[in-house]
A protein has these predicted regions:
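Helix-turn-helix repeat elements of alpha-solenoid scaffolds
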Residues: 1, 25-40, 66-81, 104-119, ...
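Generic helix N-cap/helix-start motif at coil->alpha-helix transitions
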Residues: 10-12, 53-58, 88-98, 125-137, ...
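Long, ordered, amphipathic alpha-helical scaffolds
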Residues: 207, 213-214, 218-295
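Long, well-ordered mid-to-C-terminal structural blocks that present hydrophobic/aromatic surfaces
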Residues: 172-228, 233-234
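Non-membrane alpha-helical segments in proteins
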Residues: 8-26, 52-65, 95-103, 136-140
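Solenoid-like repeat scaffolds
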Residues: 1-7, 38-47, 80-91, 118-129, ...
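Residue-level signature for tetratricopeptide repeat
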Residues: 20, 102-104, 140-142, 178-179, ...
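Mature, well-folded catalytic/scaffold domains that follow N-terminal targeting or propeptide regions
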Residues: 107, 121-131, 140, 147-152, ...
Length: 295
């Protein structure tokens, strides 16, 4: 497309490529591809509509938070540019505030997160918003601040599939299973586990799910350790080639999960690339926990 100077076709192909790179957690590559798209837009505004780029721009801004080498000042500048572009295309600031609410929750700045959630909810829903994703990320705030009952109540549209998105419903099941078990509600936890297992069927290669699997493993190590380790084997392999944020978050969740494994040793089939690899497949739980803590 570039050789034929077909800018419109090249842009469509690059937007599709960003979708594929997003599934692979290839943040740096995503950003590079989108930078080319923006350059083409600036030089060919008669061919490329800015409105067509904004959904993926939201993803790109999200990716900048995940790369430690990008200073926060630059992340904020990208956010301000995204904000300018959505406003001039007639969108509300709902998606802008939503992204900040997510990042503040991940940074455990819960007061700020709540402020952004309230600002988000005060803005109108539009085509830059995804109700299912908004609900899913809001759950993190309520679950992490100890408000399980409120989280479970708010999650009902996700649980009952009144609102859906490619992964939002599954992510809700995964974390609600863990938090319900922790809250002393094993029946709810078991229900969420069943729903999660159904949704995970056929997604054995979806490595981007790593960010959400750690707490599900923790749930299983509380209730069915063998099943938990089956998922851990898969996810540890994924963690060796994912981005920095996903590796960090998964490691944090595994430190939590391993508190519930009472055996001193476990038998695992892990890849040779794993730093603690053992040919006999026998791993010390304490050494595994130390490894994940150091990550």
């Amino acid at each position: 497309a570039d050789e034929n100077e077909d800018v419109e076709w090249a842009t469509e192909m690059r937007l599709d490529l960003i979708y594929e790179l997003n599934l692979l957690s290839a943040d740096t590559e995503e950003i590079a591809v989108f930078s080319k798209i923006l350059d083409d837009y600036e030089n060919h505004k008669d061919v490329i509509k800015e409105d067509d780029l904004l959904w993926k721009y939201k993803w790109i801004w999200s990716s900048t938070f995940d790369i430690p080498e990008i200073p926060m000042e630059q992340v904020e500048a990208v956010g301000e540019d995204y904000k300018t572009r959505i406003l001039r295309n007639g969108y509300s600031l709902r998606s802008y505030y939503q992204r900040w609410s997510v990042e503040c929750t991940w940074m455990r700045q819960y007061d700020k997160a709540k402020e952004y959630i309230d600002k988000m909810l005060a803005e109108k829903m539009d085509d830059q918003s995804c109700e299912a994703c908004e609900l899913n990320f809001m759950l993190d705030y309520y679950l992490e601040t100890g408000k399980f009952d409120e989280a479970y109540s708010r999650a009902q549209p996700l649980i009952n599939k009144q609102v859906t998105c490619y992964e939002a419903n599954l992510r809700a099941y995964l974390k609600l299973a863990y938090y319900a078990q922790k809250a002393g509600k094993p029946d709810i936890a078991a229900d969420m586990c069943t729903r999660a297992e159904e949704a995970l069927a056929g997604r054995e290669k979806d490595e981007y799910l790593l960010l959400y699997m750690g707490l599900f493993i923790a749930y299983y190590l509380m209730t069915n350790p063998e099943r938990g380790w089956e998922y851990a084997e898969r996810c540890i392999d994924w963690s060796l080639r994912t981005n920095t944020l996903k590796k960090y978050r998964f490691s944090c969740d595994m430190v939590e999960a391993l508190k519930y494994e009472m055996r001193p040793e476990v038998h695992l089939a892990l890849p040779e690339e794993f730093p603690l690899y053992r040919a006999d497949g026998v791993y010390s739980v304490s050494e595994l926990r130390r490894y994940f803590y150091q990550q």
